[in-house]
């Protein structure tokens, strides 16, 4: 997809390796099933506690979510801009999608759902 192509071009090979490694480590930590992760890659997020843990783990590793569970808006925008190559678009997504839910896991899940509404292929196989 175009979005994934842009993501690959905007991120260095080192970035991609780190994301894949982080995703693998988080999968081990969260226990999320491969089936649920495959669906998530396609933009189909199941309301699954292990998937939520997976997303939170990745967001923490990318420093998008603080230890407190709150979204780090500046870091979130910076990471998005590296993928979108569009500062204005990233700003709009951050403003719209920076939410705080009852738990850090729910926050990561809802942020992901929000981003995927506008960009269904945004995360591709890089982030989950």
From Swiss-Prot:
Its main location: secreted. Transmembrane segments: none annotated. It holds the Pfam family PBP_GOBP. The keyword Signal applies. Tubular accessory sex gland. Keywords: Disulfide bond, Glycoprotein, Secreted, Signal. GO terms for cellular component: extracellular space. Residues 1-10 form the signal peptide. GO terms for molecular function: odorant binding. Disulfide bonds join 26-57, 97-114. InterPro entries: PBP/GOBP (IPR006170), PBP_GOBP_sf (IPR036728). One of its GO terms (biological process) is sensory perception of smell. It is found in: Secreted. N-glycosylated. Belongs to the PBP/GOBP family. May be a carrier protein for lipids. This is B2 protein. The lineage of its organism: Eukaryota, Metazoa, Ecdysozoa, Arthropoda, Hexapoda.
């Amino acid at each position: 997809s175009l979005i994934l192509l842009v993501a690959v071009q905007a991120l260095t090979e080192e970035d991609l390796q780190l994301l894949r490694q982080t995703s693998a480590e988080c999968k081990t930590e969260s226990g999320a099933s491969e089936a649920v992760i495959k669906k998530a890659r396609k933009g189909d997020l199941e309301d699954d506690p292990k998937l939520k843990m997976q997303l939170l783990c990745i967001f923490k590793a990318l420093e998008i979510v603080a230890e407190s569970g709150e979204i780090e808006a500046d870091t979130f925008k910076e990471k998005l801009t590296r993928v979108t190559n569009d500062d204005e678009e990233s700003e709009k997504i951050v403003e719209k999608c920076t939410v705080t839910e009852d738990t850090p896991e729910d926050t990561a899940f809802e942020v992901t759902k929000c981003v995927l509404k506008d960009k269904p292929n945004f995360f591709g196989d890089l982030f989950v």
